[in-house]
Amino acid sequence: MKKIGVLAIQGAVDEHIQMIESAGALAFKVKHSNDLAGLDGLVLPGGESTTMRKIMKRYDLMEPVKAFAKEGKAIFGTCAGLVLLSKEIEGGEESLGLLDATAIRNGFGRQKESFEAELSVDVFDAPTFEAIFIRAPYLIEPSDEVTVLATIDGKIVAAKQANILVTAFHPELTNDNRWMRYFLEKIL
């Protein structure tokens, strides 16, 4: 059975663990770099990307997560996870640099502009996915290596590149585990 870690420093950690288990994998909380050993994949949950980056640096997780990805291990970033995984963040903040695109933090506005929307996602059997956007980012300037999986109003809100999958929204806050199944079956 596949073993997936969830970076447990902020965000909907328990919801991601439930989603991983509902998709048929084992889930583990990751708080330290040695927690990455033996994992097949890692989820970087939503939260506040600047705070998450600071905590990752304090606990010496930035370089181990980069090394994890460079070993070919899969990473799924949601919301703030998308921001952290992007090659660049508008405004010049440090990132993991693993997805060749630029992230626009809070691209859809602040907390009061949070919303739900139906997305068309060609990689799923069902026609739409109900997505929850909370202070959501989006991507711009993806390289040719990046495959866009979903957009809303022309803004990229889901993408993949090699062993990296990102969503600007929070699939873990729904009862629909298709994004996690996609991660386990197609990205891992």
Swiss-Prot record:
A Gene Ontology biological process term: pyridoxal phosphate biosynthetic process
Superkingdom of the source species: Bacteria
Molecular-function GO term, any one: glutaminase activity
Active site per UniProt: 79 (nucleophile), 170 (charge relay system), 172 (charge relay system)
Signal sequence annotation: none
A GO CC annotation given for this chain: glutaminase complex
UniProt keyword list: Glutamine amidotransferase, Hydrolase, Lyase, Pyridoxal phosphate
Known pathway: Cofactor biosynthesis; pyridoxal 5'-phosphate biosynthesis
Entry's EC annotation: 4.3.3.6, 3.5.1.2
Disulfide cross-links: none
Reactions accelerated catalytically: aldehydo-D-ribose 5-phosphate + D-glyceraldehyde 3-phosphate + L-glutamine = pyridoxal 5'-phosphate + L-glutamate + phosphate + 3 H2O + H(+); L-glutamine + H2O = L-glutamate + NH4(+)
Binding sites annotated in the UniProt record for L-glutamine: 47-49, 105, 134-135
Known function: Catalyzes the hydrolysis of glutamine to glutamate and ammonia as part of the biosynthesis of pyridoxal 5'-phosphate. The resulting ammonia molecule is channeled to the active site of PdxS.
HAMAP family given in the database record: PdxT
Oligomer and partners: In the presence of PdxS, forms a dodecamer of heterodimers. Only shows activity in the heterodimer.
PANTHER family xrefs: PYRIDOXAL 5'-PHOSPHATE SYNTHASE SUBUNIT SNO (PTHR31559), PYRIDOXAL 5'-PHOSPHATE SYNTHASE SUBUNIT SNO1-RELATED (PTHR31559:SF0)
Family according to the record: Belongs to the glutaminase PdxT/SNO family.
UniProt-recorded name of the protein: Pyridoxal 5'-phosphate synthase subunit PdxT
Organism, as annotated: Listeria monocytogenes serotype 4a (strain HCC23)
